[in-house]
């Protein structure tokens, strides 16, 4: 009878449906399988797997607050996986900070007013940030101003400068100069060669002049014959 009772208890304990068998097997496996964390604490594998999956889902959504709402095992599992996620989030934040800083720099550069003509080259040196202009004829104007000041202090010099002759002599003066030169050359040639170059005829003197070109009438008579 004892065997019968034991066998009946075993038959009653054995589940009939496959789902019940699977649940019983899972419970048996979970009761005997543990995971050892880095902290040295042993956590059931089923709880750690459930916590890790929930943590991964929440990390994909971008939040870490959901890990604290789970059990202690899931929170520790989350904490064990947190260094990589925190490093990635910190890197993203650093990248965003760098982008923001660069963007701000570009905005400041775009808002900064243009310098325009604030850069001037003076004798090979670049002077920035100062608006300067050089006049092209500043030296000549200074010299003219100095001469004007000298003329004011010396009236005689100013009068002499006003009486200066023009650069080109007048036409009458040129004609008189060449007329005198031609007359002197005519007299010299007449006295030396007894010939008047102005009238183109010989004069009385030591030389006897003969025409080299025949007369026009004589040449005409010769051609007619």
From Swiss-Prot:
Q: Compositional bias (Low complexity) spans? A: 71-82
GO terms under biological process: regulation of cell cycle
Give start-end positions of Basic residues composition bias. Answer: 55-67
Q: Does the keyword Nuclease apply?
A: no
Keyword Ribonucleoprotein (UniProt): no
Q: Where is this region: Disordered?
A: 47-94, 130-169
User: What is the top-level taxon of the source organism?
Assistant: Eukaryota
Sorted alphabetically, which InterPro entries does this protein's record hold?
CDI_dom, CDI_dom_sf, KRP
Q: Which UniProt keywords apply?
A: Protein kinase inhibitor
Cellular component, GO, one term: nucleus
Stretches with biased composition (Basic and acidic residues): 143-153
Any transmembrane segments, and where? none
MF terms (GO), sorted A to Z: cyclin-dependent protein serine/threonine kinase inhibitor activity
Instruction: List the PANTHER family hit by this protein, alphabetically.
Output: CYCLIN-DEPENDENT KINASE INHIBITOR 4-RELATED
Q: Which family does it belong to?
A: Belongs to the CDI family. ICK/KRP subfamily.
Protein name as catalogued: Cyclin-dependent kinase inhibitor 3
- What does the record give as the organism's lineage? Eukaryota, Viridiplantae, Streptophyta, Embryophyta, Tracheophyta
């Amino acid at each position: 009878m004892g065997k019968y009772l034991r066998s009946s208890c075993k038959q009653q304990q054995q589940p009939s449906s496959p789902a019940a068998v699977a649940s019983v097997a899972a419970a048996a496996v979970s009761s005997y399988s543990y995971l050892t964390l880095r902290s040295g604490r042993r956590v059931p594998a089923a709880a750690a797997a459930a916590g890790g999956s929930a943590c991964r889902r929440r990390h994909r959504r971008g939040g870490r607050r959901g890990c604290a709402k789970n059990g202690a095992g899931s929170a520790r599992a989350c904490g064990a996986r947190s260094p990589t996620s925190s490093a990635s989030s910190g890197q993203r934040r650093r990248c965003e900070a760098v982008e923001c800083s660069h963007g701000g720099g570009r905005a400041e550069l775009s808002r900064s007013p243009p310098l325009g003509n604030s850069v001037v080259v003076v004798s090979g040196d670049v002077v920035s940030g100062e608006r300067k202009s050089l006049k092209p004829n500043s030296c000549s104007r200074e010299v003219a101003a100095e001469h004007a000041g000298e003329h004011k202090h010396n009236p005689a010099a100013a009068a002499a400068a006003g009486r200066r002759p023009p650069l080109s002599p007048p036409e009458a003066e040129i004609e008189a100069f060449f007329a005198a030169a031609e007359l002197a050359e005519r007299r010299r040639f007449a006295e030396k060669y007894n010939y008047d170059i102005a009238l183109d005829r010989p004069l009385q003197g030591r030389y006897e002049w003969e025409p080299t070109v025949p007369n026009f009438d004589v040449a005409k008579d010769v051609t007619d014959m």
